[in-house]
Amino acid sequence: ADDEEELRLLVKKARREIRASYLKYESQENPDQCVLIQEKLRGQEYGLDVIHDLKGNQRTVVVKEKEAMRSGETDGAKTVDHERLRRLGQILGSLTRHKGNLDVDAFESDGVCYVLEMNARFGGGYPFSHAAGVNLPYALVKWALGQEPEEKYLAARAGVRAQKDIRIMIYKEESK
């Protein structure tokens, strides 16, 4: 929205669309607060994989600069050495003490880091950490067996740029 009047119209339209969809059930408890307005930031978006062992001990934080997005998911990224964001991931991990991966979306704007969302799961950006050398599935299996994975499986190389690819595969052509 370019101004408050346009914002009010867009919120009104969004509420009308919510009332006309299945979301009306999700928002019926407080219909006046069914629309979330998020400030648009100018800057760079990042993805963090905050990796812990199965006891909740922090093992590593991988920072990826998002270069391309598709349908809200990271489509292209580069692993980077970003000390401030790595430290942010360490702080979040020390507070959550989660097990496995904490997928964090962060934004840096005018030198300030913002956390957009956190999900305790393999996120759509994990393949970029994997491409840079991290092998979290292997580490999780080792930890589940009471063993320690080799450090190389928890270390991401900075500067690895990767892109997801979607291809249509024909496995077998039906004969007529």
Predicted regions and their residues:
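A general structural signal for well-ordered secondary-structure junctions
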Residues: L7, E17-A20, K99, E150
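Active-site donor-binding loop signature of nucleotide-sugar glycosyltransferases
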Residues: D2-D3, E39, E65, A120
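Phosphate/diphosphate-binding glycine-rich loops and adjacent basic-rich segments that engage nucleotide
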Residues: A1-A14
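ATP-dependent carboxylate activation and anion-phosphoryl transfer catalytic cores
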Residues: K78-K176
